[in-house]
Amino acid sequence: MSMTTPIVDFVRSYAKSGTARLHMPGHKGQSLLGFEPLDITEICGADELYAPEGIIAESEANATRLFGTAHSYYSTEGSSQCIRAMLFLALQGAPQNGKRPVLLAARNAHKALLYAAALLDFDICWLWPSAQAEGALCSCPVTAEALTGALHAMVQQGNTPFGVYVTSPDYLGGVQDIPALAAVCRAQDVPLLVDNAHGAYLRFLPQNCHPIAQGAAMCCDSAHKTLPVVTGGAYLHLAHDAPVQDEAAVRGALALFGSTSPSYLILQSLDACNAVLAGDYPRRLVQCCAALEGLRRSLNKAAAARQCPVPLAVAGAQQEPMKLTLDAAALGCTGTALADALRRAQLECEYADPRYVVLMFTPENPPQDYTRLQTVLEQLLAAVPAGLLRPENRAGEFAALQQQAVQRCTIRQAVLGAQVRVPVHKALGRVCAMPTVSCPPAIPVAVSGEEITPAAIALMQRYGIKELSVLR
Protein backbone atom coordinates (compact mmCIF):
# COMPACT_ATOMS: atom_id res chain seq x y z
CA MET A 1 0.00 0.00 0.00
CA SER A 2 1.42 3.37 -1.03
CA MET A 3 1.40 5.90 1.81
CA THR A 4 2.08 9.63 1.96
CA THR A 5 4.00 11.28 4.80
CA PRO A 6 2.80 14.90 4.60
CA ILE A 7 4.05 16.08 8.00
CA VAL A 8 7.53 14.67 7.47
CA ASP A 9 7.70 16.13 3.97
CA PHE A 10 6.60 19.61 5.08
CA VAL A 11 9.05 19.82 8.00
CA ARG A 12 12.00 18.58 5.96
CA SER A 13 11.22 21.08 3.23
CA TYR A 14 11.00 23.89 5.77
CA ALA A 15 14.27 22.83 7.42
CA LYS A 16 16.03 23.06 4.05
CA SER A 17 14.39 26.32 2.97
CA GLY A 18 16.70 28.73 4.78
CA THR A 19 13.70 30.62 6.17
CA ALA A 20 14.53 32.91 9.09
CA ARG A 21 12.83 31.38 12.13
CA LEU A 22 11.28 34.40 13.78
CA HIS A 23 8.96 32.16 15.78
CA MET A 24 9.17 29.56 18.53
CA PRO A 25 10.98 27.39 19.60
CA GLY A 26 13.91 29.30 20.97
CA HIS A 27 16.65 27.06 19.60
CA LYS A 28 15.81 28.40 16.08
CA GLY A 29 16.73 25.11 14.46
CA GLN A 30 20.35 25.27 15.60
CA SER A 31 21.64 21.83 16.52
CA LEU A 32 22.39 21.13 20.16
CA LEU A 33 21.27 17.51 20.23
CA GLY A 34 20.76 17.10 16.49
CA PHE A 35 16.98 17.10 16.11
CA GLU A 36 16.46 20.87 16.35
CA PRO A 37 16.17 21.64 12.59
CA LEU A 38 13.09 19.39 12.48
CA ASP A 39 11.51 20.81 15.66
CA ILE A 40 8.93 23.42 14.68
CA THR A 41 5.65 24.80 15.95
CA GLU A 42 2.29 25.50 14.31
CA ILE A 43 3.58 27.90 11.64
CA CYS A 44 1.80 28.63 8.37
CA GLY A 45 1.39 25.37 6.47
CA ALA A 46 2.17 23.17 9.47
CA ASP A 47 -1.54 22.76 10.32
CA GLU A 48 -2.98 22.59 13.87
CA LEU A 49 -3.31 19.35 15.82
CA TYR A 50 -6.66 20.21 17.39
CA ALA A 51 -8.16 21.88 14.31
CA PRO A 52 -6.44 20.21 11.35
CA GLU A 53 -7.28 21.01 7.75
CA GLY A 54 -4.00 20.22 5.99
CA ILE A 55 -1.04 17.94 6.55
CA ILE A 56 -2.13 16.65 9.98
CA ALA A 57 -5.64 15.92 8.68
CA GLU A 58 -4.13 14.00 5.75
CA SER A 59 -1.79 12.04 8.02
CA GLU A 60 -4.57 11.13 10.47
CA ALA A 61 -6.71 9.99 7.53
CA ASN A 62 -3.85 7.67 6.56
CA ALA A 63 -3.74 6.27 10.11
CA THR A 64 -7.52 5.84 10.12
CA ARG A 65 -7.35 3.71 6.96
CA LEU A 66 -4.49 1.65 8.37
CA PHE A 67 -6.28 0.91 11.65
CA GLY A 68 -9.72 0.44 10.08
CA THR A 69 -11.47 2.75 12.53
CA ALA A 70 -14.16 5.41 12.21
CA HIS A 71 -11.41 7.89 13.08
CA SER A 72 -7.93 7.67 14.59
CA TYR A 73 -6.69 10.82 16.32
CA TYR A 74 -3.07 11.65 17.11
CA SER A 75 -1.76 12.45 20.57
CA THR A 76 1.71 13.74 21.38
CA GLU A 77 1.16 13.18 25.12
CA GLY A 78 0.78 9.43 25.29
CA SER A 79 -2.18 7.26 26.17
CA SER A 80 -2.66 9.24 29.39
CA GLN A 81 -4.11 12.13 27.36
CA CYS A 82 -6.19 9.72 25.28
CA ILE A 83 -7.58 7.97 28.37
CA ARG A 84 -8.82 11.26 29.81
CA ALA A 85 -10.35 12.31 26.50
CA MET A 86 -11.96 8.89 26.01
CA LEU A 87 -13.61 9.00 29.42
CA PHE A 88 -14.73 12.60 28.89
CA LEU A 89 -16.39 11.56 25.61
CA ALA A 90 -18.05 8.53 27.21
CA LEU A 91 -19.47 10.82 29.89
CA GLN A 92 -20.70 13.28 27.28
CA GLY A 93 -22.43 10.51 25.35
CA ALA A 94 -24.09 8.81 28.32
CA PRO A 95 -27.77 9.27 29.27
CA GLN A 96 -28.23 11.51 32.30
CA ASN A 97 -29.98 9.79 35.22
CA GLY A 98 -29.60 12.46 37.89
CA LYS A 99 -27.06 10.39 39.82
CA ARG A 100 -23.30 10.64 40.13
CA PRO A 101 -21.72 9.07 37.05
CA VAL A 102 -20.02 5.74 37.63
CA LEU A 103 -17.58 3.70 35.56
CA LEU A 104 -17.28 -0.08 35.80
CA ALA A 105 -13.56 -0.86 35.55
CA ALA A 106 -11.12 -3.73 36.00
CA ARG A 107 -8.96 -3.10 39.06
CA ASN A 108 -5.58 -3.33 37.26
CA ALA A 109 -6.04 0.12 35.73
CA HIS A 110 -3.24 2.61 35.18
CA LYS A 111 -3.21 5.63 37.49
CA ALA A 112 -4.27 7.77 34.50
CA LEU A 113 -7.79 6.43 35.08
CA LEU A 114 -7.80 7.75 38.65
CA TYR A 115 -6.52 11.14 37.54
CA ALA A 116 -9.33 11.24 34.98
CA ALA A 117 -11.86 10.36 37.69
CA ALA A 118 -10.52 13.21 39.83
CA LEU A 119 -10.66 15.72 37.00
CA LEU A 120 -14.07 14.62 35.66
CA ASP A 121 -15.54 13.75 39.09
CA PHE A 122 -16.95 10.29 38.51
CA ASP A 123 -17.00 7.21 40.73
CA ILE A 124 -15.58 3.79 39.89
CA CYS A 125 -17.11 0.40 40.63
CA TRP A 126 -14.30 -2.14 40.49
CA LEU A 127 -14.17 -5.52 38.79
CA TRP A 128 -11.79 -7.66 40.84
CA PRO A 129 -9.77 -10.74 39.86
CA SER A 130 -11.45 -14.05 40.52
CA ALA A 131 -10.39 -16.30 43.38
CA GLN A 132 -8.84 -18.62 40.77
CA ALA A 133 -6.49 -15.92 39.46
CA GLU A 134 -2.77 -16.24 40.20
CA GLY A 135 -2.61 -13.00 42.16
CA ALA A 136 -0.58 -10.24 40.55
CA LEU A 137 -0.92 -6.47 40.71
CA CYS A 138 -0.87 -6.15 36.92
CA SER A 139 -3.54 -8.77 36.16
CA CYS A 140 -7.31 -8.76 36.41
CA PRO A 141 -8.91 -11.22 33.98
CA VAL A 142 -12.60 -10.38 33.47
CA THR A 143 -14.96 -13.06 32.19
CA ALA A 144 -18.13 -12.35 30.26
CA GLU A 145 -20.07 -13.99 33.09
CA ALA A 146 -18.53 -11.73 35.73
CA LEU A 147 -19.15 -8.64 33.63
CA THR A 148 -22.75 -9.68 32.95
CA GLY A 149 -23.38 -10.11 36.67
CA ALA A 150 -21.79 -6.79 37.60
CA LEU A 151 -23.64 -4.87 34.89
CA HIS A 152 -26.95 -6.52 35.76
CA ALA A 153 -26.55 -5.59 39.43
CA MET A 154 -25.79 -1.96 38.58
CA VAL A 155 -28.69 -1.69 36.12
CA GLN A 156 -31.05 -3.20 38.71
CA GLN A 157 -29.94 -0.50 41.15
CA GLY A 158 -30.75 2.16 38.55
CA ASN A 159 -27.10 3.12 38.23
CA THR A 160 -26.07 2.02 34.75
CA PRO A 161 -22.37 2.83 34.23
CA PHE A 162 -21.39 5.27 31.51
CA GLY A 163 -18.81 2.75 30.32
CA VAL A 164 -16.94 -0.47 31.00
CA TYR A 165 -13.16 0.00 31.15
CA VAL A 166 -10.55 -2.73 30.82
CA THR A 167 -6.80 -2.85 30.26
CA SER A 168 -5.79 -5.22 27.48
CA PRO A 169 -3.01 -6.21 27.02
CA ASP A 170 -1.95 -5.73 30.62
CA TYR A 171 1.60 -5.16 31.81
CA LEU A 172 2.33 -8.90 32.08
CA GLY A 173 1.01 -9.52 28.57
CA GLY A 174 -2.40 -10.90 29.54
CA VAL A 175 -5.24 -10.14 27.14
CA GLN A 176 -8.94 -9.89 27.87
CA ASP A 177 -11.61 -11.67 25.80
CA ILE A 178 -12.58 -8.43 24.09
CA PRO A 179 -15.18 -9.94 21.69
CA ALA A 180 -17.05 -11.57 24.59
CA LEU A 181 -16.88 -8.44 26.78
CA ALA A 182 -17.97 -6.26 23.84
CA ALA A 183 -21.01 -8.48 23.27
CA VAL A 184 -22.04 -8.11 26.92
CA CYS A 185 -21.62 -4.33 26.76
CA ARG A 186 -23.56 -4.07 23.50
CA ALA A 187 -26.46 -6.01 25.00
CA GLN A 188 -26.68 -3.41 27.81
CA ASP A 189 -25.98 -0.45 25.48
CA VAL A 190 -22.87 0.48 27.46
CA PRO A 191 -19.66 1.37 25.57
CA LEU A 192 -16.59 -0.80 26.06
CA LEU A 193 -13.51 1.38 26.58
CA VAL A 194 -10.10 -0.29 26.30
CA ASP A 195 -6.71 0.86 27.50
CA ASN A 196 -4.79 -0.76 24.64
CA ALA A 197 -1.61 1.18 25.37
CA HIS A 198 0.50 -1.95 24.98
CA GLY A 199 -1.29 -3.28 21.89
CA ALA A 200 -1.07 -0.87 18.95
CA TYR A 201 0.61 -3.62 16.91
CA LEU A 202 -2.35 -6.01 17.32
CA ARG A 203 -4.05 -4.47 14.28
CA PHE A 204 -1.25 -5.74 12.06
CA LEU A 205 -1.25 -9.40 13.08
CA PRO A 206 -2.75 -11.74 10.46
CA GLN A 207 -5.85 -12.26 12.65
CA ASN A 208 -6.27 -8.52 13.58
CA CYS A 209 -6.70 -8.65 17.36
CA HIS A 210 -7.09 -4.89 17.80
CA PRO A 211 -9.84 -3.89 20.27
CA ILE A 212 -11.71 -1.80 17.69
CA ALA A 213 -11.85 -4.78 15.33
CA GLN A 214 -13.09 -6.92 18.23
CA GLY A 215 -15.96 -4.66 19.26
CA ALA A 216 -14.64 -1.91 21.55
CA ALA A 217 -16.33 1.48 21.18
CA MET A 218 -13.13 3.44 21.88
CA CYS A 219 -9.56 2.63 22.78
CA CYS A 220 -6.19 4.27 23.23
CA ASP A 221 -2.92 2.97 21.81
CA SER A 222 0.54 4.06 22.87
CA ALA A 223 2.20 3.92 19.47
CA HIS A 224 5.56 4.50 21.12
CA LYS A 225 5.32 1.33 23.23
CA THR A 226 5.23 -1.22 20.40
CA LEU A 227 5.54 0.63 17.08
CA PRO A 228 8.57 2.53 15.70
CA VAL A 229 7.42 5.86 17.16
CA VAL A 230 9.22 8.19 19.57
CA THR A 231 8.09 8.46 23.18
CA GLY A 232 4.75 10.24 23.60
CA GLY A 233 3.18 9.25 20.29
CA ALA A 234 -0.28 7.75 20.74
CA TYR A 235 -3.69 7.30 19.14
CA LEU A 236 -7.28 7.70 20.27
CA HIS A 237 -9.35 5.32 18.14
CA LEU A 238 -13.12 5.55 17.71
CA ALA A 239 -15.32 2.77 16.35
CA HIS A 240 -18.38 3.52 14.25
CA ASP A 241 -20.59 2.95 17.32
CA ALA A 242 -18.62 5.22 19.68
CA PRO A 243 -20.96 7.34 21.83
CA VAL A 244 -19.63 10.59 20.32
CA GLN A 245 -18.68 10.85 16.64
CA ASP A 246 -18.50 14.61 16.11
CA GLU A 247 -14.90 15.37 15.14
CA ALA A 248 -14.88 18.82 16.72
CA ALA A 249 -16.11 17.34 20.01
CA VAL A 250 -13.38 14.69 20.00
CA ARG A 251 -10.67 17.22 19.23
CA GLY A 252 -12.07 19.45 21.95
CA ALA A 253 -11.79 16.58 24.42
CA LEU A 254 -8.16 15.98 23.46
CA ALA A 255 -7.40 19.70 23.65
CA LEU A 256 -8.95 19.86 27.11
CA PHE A 257 -6.23 17.55 28.43
CA GLY A 258 -3.38 18.45 26.08
CA SER A 259 -0.75 21.12 25.61
CA THR A 260 -1.28 23.93 23.12
CA SER A 261 2.31 23.24 21.98
CA PRO A 262 2.23 19.71 20.57
CA SER A 263 5.58 18.22 19.60
CA TYR A 264 6.13 18.20 15.86
CA LEU A 265 8.92 15.70 16.36
CA ILE A 266 6.32 13.26 17.71
CA LEU A 267 3.85 14.15 14.95
CA GLN A 268 6.52 13.45 12.33
CA SER A 269 7.22 10.12 14.00
CA LEU A 270 3.54 9.14 13.90
CA ASP A 271 3.38 10.26 10.28
CA ALA A 272 6.49 8.31 9.28
CA CYS A 273 5.14 5.25 11.08
CA ASN A 274 2.19 5.15 8.67
CA ALA A 275 4.58 4.43 5.81
CA VAL A 276 6.25 1.68 7.86
CA LEU A 277 2.90 0.07 8.71
CA ALA A 278 1.81 0.22 5.08
CA GLY A 279 5.05 -1.48 4.00
CA ASP A 280 6.58 -4.75 5.17
CA TYR A 281 5.85 -4.24 8.87
CA PRO A 282 3.16 -6.98 9.04
CA ARG A 283 5.61 -9.52 7.60
CA ARG A 284 8.35 -8.50 10.04
CA LEU A 285 5.82 -8.58 12.89
CA VAL A 286 4.95 -12.20 12.10
CA GLN A 287 8.66 -13.04 12.11
CA CYS A 288 9.16 -11.32 15.47
CA CYS A 289 6.23 -13.14 17.08
CA ALA A 290 7.42 -16.47 15.66
CA ALA A 291 10.92 -15.89 17.04
CA LEU A 292 9.50 -15.10 20.47
CA GLU A 293 7.27 -18.17 20.43
CA GLY A 294 10.29 -20.28 19.57
CA LEU A 295 12.23 -18.69 22.42
CA ARG A 296 9.39 -19.39 24.88
CA ARG A 297 9.26 -23.04 23.88
CA SER A 298 13.02 -23.41 24.10
CA LEU A 299 13.19 -21.80 27.54
CA ASN A 300 10.31 -23.85 28.89
CA LYS A 301 11.79 -27.06 27.51
CA ALA A 302 15.05 -26.25 29.28
CA ALA A 303 13.17 -25.36 32.48
CA ALA A 304 11.27 -28.66 32.37
CA ALA A 305 14.53 -30.54 31.89
CA ARG A 306 15.85 -28.87 35.05
CA GLN A 307 12.59 -29.80 36.84
CA CYS A 308 11.78 -26.18 37.59
CA PRO A 309 8.56 -25.82 39.58
CA VAL A 310 6.90 -23.60 36.94
CA PRO A 311 7.57 -22.72 33.28
CA LEU A 312 10.14 -19.95 32.91
CA ALA A 313 8.27 -18.15 30.10
CA VAL A 314 4.60 -17.37 30.67
CA ALA A 315 2.64 -18.79 27.74
CA GLY A 316 -0.93 -19.51 26.68
CA ALA A 317 -3.81 -18.36 24.54
CA GLN A 318 -4.48 -15.37 26.80
CA GLN A 319 -0.96 -13.96 26.36
CA GLU A 320 -0.08 -11.36 23.76
CA PRO A 321 2.63 -12.58 21.37
CA MET A 322 5.14 -9.71 21.54
CA LYS A 323 5.91 -9.68 25.26
CA LEU A 324 8.21 -12.19 26.90
CA THR A 325 7.13 -12.49 30.53
CA LEU A 326 9.48 -14.50 32.72
CA ASP A 327 8.38 -16.19 35.94
CA ALA A 328 11.41 -15.86 38.21
CA ALA A 329 9.97 -18.54 40.51
CA ALA A 330 11.23 -21.04 37.92
CA LEU A 331 14.76 -19.99 38.89
CA GLY A 332 14.12 -19.82 42.62
CA CYS A 333 14.57 -16.05 42.82
CA THR A 334 12.54 -12.84 42.70
CA GLY A 335 11.73 -10.93 39.56
CA THR A 336 13.85 -8.01 40.72
CA ALA A 337 16.84 -10.31 41.28
CA LEU A 338 16.38 -11.80 37.82
CA ALA A 339 16.21 -8.31 36.31
CA ASP A 340 19.48 -7.45 38.06
CA ALA A 341 21.12 -10.55 36.60
CA LEU A 342 19.92 -9.63 33.12
CA ARG A 343 21.13 -6.06 33.58
CA ARG A 344 24.61 -7.31 34.43
CA ALA A 345 24.56 -9.03 31.04
CA GLN A 346 23.52 -5.74 29.37
CA LEU A 347 19.90 -6.78 28.97
CA GLU A 348 17.53 -4.08 30.25
CA CYS A 349 14.00 -5.18 31.05
CA GLU A 350 10.77 -3.19 30.86
CA TYR A 351 9.45 -4.16 34.29
CA ALA A 352 10.23 -6.37 37.26
CA ASP A 353 8.29 -7.13 40.43
CA PRO A 354 8.63 -9.69 43.23
CA ARG A 355 7.78 -12.53 40.82
CA TYR A 356 7.82 -11.49 37.16
CA VAL A 357 10.11 -9.84 34.62
CA VAL A 358 8.64 -8.31 31.47
CA LEU A 359 10.72 -8.03 28.31
CA MET A 360 9.30 -6.13 25.35
CA PHE A 361 10.42 -7.04 21.84
CA THR A 362 9.47 -5.51 18.49
CA PRO A 363 10.54 -6.18 14.89
CA GLU A 364 13.23 -3.55 15.46
CA ASN A 365 15.17 -5.82 17.86
CA PRO A 366 18.17 -7.38 16.06
CA PRO A 367 18.73 -11.17 16.19
CA GLN A 368 21.60 -10.81 18.66
CA ASP A 369 19.15 -9.56 21.32
CA TYR A 370 17.36 -12.92 21.23
CA THR A 371 20.63 -14.85 21.23
CA ARG A 372 22.13 -12.94 24.16
CA LEU A 373 18.96 -13.33 26.22
CA GLN A 374 18.67 -17.05 25.55
CA THR A 375 22.33 -17.61 26.41
CA VAL A 376 22.05 -15.78 29.74
CA LEU A 377 18.80 -17.50 30.73
CA GLU A 378 20.17 -20.93 29.87
CA GLN A 379 23.18 -20.19 32.08
CA LEU A 380 20.84 -19.23 34.92
CA LEU A 381 18.77 -22.38 34.37
CA ALA A 382 21.89 -24.51 34.55
CA ALA A 383 22.52 -23.16 38.05
CA VAL A 384 19.00 -23.84 39.37
CA PRO A 385 19.16 -25.96 42.54
CA ALA A 386 17.14 -29.15 42.76
CA GLY A 387 13.95 -29.41 44.76
CA LEU A 388 12.50 -25.93 44.26
CA LEU A 389 8.91 -25.69 45.49
CA ARG A 390 6.03 -24.21 43.55
CA PRO A 391 5.50 -20.54 44.44
CA GLU A 392 2.70 -19.69 46.81
CA ASN A 393 -0.53 -18.57 45.16
CA ARG A 394 -1.01 -14.92 46.17
CA ALA A 395 -4.66 -14.62 45.13
CA GLY A 396 -5.63 -14.46 48.79
CA GLU A 397 -3.81 -11.14 49.19
CA PHE A 398 -5.97 -9.55 46.51
CA ALA A 399 -9.11 -11.20 47.87
CA ALA A 400 -8.31 -9.62 51.24
CA LEU A 401 -7.73 -6.27 49.55
CA GLN A 402 -11.17 -6.52 47.95
CA GLN A 403 -12.88 -7.61 51.17
CA GLN A 404 -11.33 -4.81 53.22
CA ALA A 405 -11.66 -2.01 50.62
CA VAL A 406 -13.84 0.89 51.83
CA GLN A 407 -14.30 4.13 49.89
CA ARG A 408 -14.32 6.98 52.43
CA CYS A 409 -14.68 9.88 49.97
CA THR A 410 -14.77 10.51 46.24
CA ILE A 411 -11.63 10.15 44.18
CA ARG A 412 -11.79 13.86 43.37
CA GLN A 413 -12.03 14.85 47.04
CA ALA A 414 -9.04 12.65 47.85
CA VAL A 415 -6.79 13.76 45.00
CA LEU A 416 -7.52 17.47 45.46
CA GLY A 417 -7.66 17.46 49.27
CA ALA A 418 -4.94 18.61 51.67
CA GLN A 419 -2.51 15.73 52.07
CA VAL A 420 0.69 14.58 53.69
CA ARG A 421 3.27 11.87 52.96
CA VAL A 422 3.58 9.14 55.59
CA PRO A 423 5.50 5.85 55.81
CA VAL A 424 3.41 2.89 54.71
CA HIS A 425 3.67 1.21 58.13
CA LYS A 426 2.07 4.29 59.73
CA ALA A 427 -0.79 4.63 57.22
CA LEU A 428 -3.28 2.16 58.68
CA GLY A 429 -6.75 3.70 58.86
CA ARG A 430 -5.78 6.82 56.91
CA VAL A 431 -7.46 7.77 53.62
CA CYS A 432 -5.41 7.39 50.46
CA ALA A 433 -4.94 10.71 48.63
CA MET A 434 -2.79 10.32 45.52
CA PRO A 435 -2.71 6.81 44.01
CA THR A 436 -0.09 4.52 45.56
CA VAL A 437 2.02 3.25 42.68
CA SER A 438 5.46 2.23 41.59
CA CYS A 439 6.22 3.15 38.01
CA PRO A 440 6.23 1.01 36.02
CA PRO A 441 3.58 -0.39 36.14
CA ALA A 442 1.78 2.65 37.65
CA ILE A 443 -1.11 0.48 38.87
CA PRO A 444 -2.48 1.54 42.28
CA VAL A 445 -2.59 -0.79 45.26
CA ALA A 446 -4.81 1.62 47.18
CA VAL A 447 -7.16 3.90 45.27
CA SER A 448 -7.65 7.56 46.08
CA GLY A 449 -10.42 7.91 48.65
CA GLU A 450 -10.03 4.37 50.02
CA GLU A 451 -9.12 3.63 53.61
CA ILE A 452 -5.65 2.14 54.01
CA THR A 453 -6.23 -1.40 55.29
CA PRO A 454 -3.92 -4.16 56.58
CA ALA A 455 -4.22 -5.91 53.20
CA ALA A 456 -3.26 -2.73 51.35
CA ILE A 457 -0.23 -2.21 53.59
CA ALA A 458 0.91 -5.81 53.06
CA LEU A 459 0.70 -5.44 49.28
CA MET A 460 2.44 -2.07 49.24
CA GLN A 461 5.30 -3.49 51.26
CA ARG A 462 5.51 -6.49 48.96
CA TYR A 463 5.77 -4.22 45.91
CA GLY A 464 8.39 -1.98 47.49
CA ILE A 465 6.22 1.09 48.14
CA LYS A 466 7.70 2.78 51.20
CA GLU A 467 5.47 5.84 51.67
CA LEU A 468 2.23 7.29 50.36
CA SER A 469 0.08 10.39 50.37
CA VAL A 470 -2.90 10.41 52.74
CA LEU A 471 -5.48 13.05 53.60
CA ARG A 472 -4.54 15.26 56.53
Question: What is the role of each PLM region?
Answer:
Residues G29, Y171, H224-T226, D241-P243, ...:
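Short, glycine-/Ser/Thr-/acidic-enriched flexible segments
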Residues A70-S72, K99-L103, V445:
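Short active-site oxyanion
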Residues E467:
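Terminal helix/beta-alpha structural elements that buttress the NAD(P)+-binding lobe
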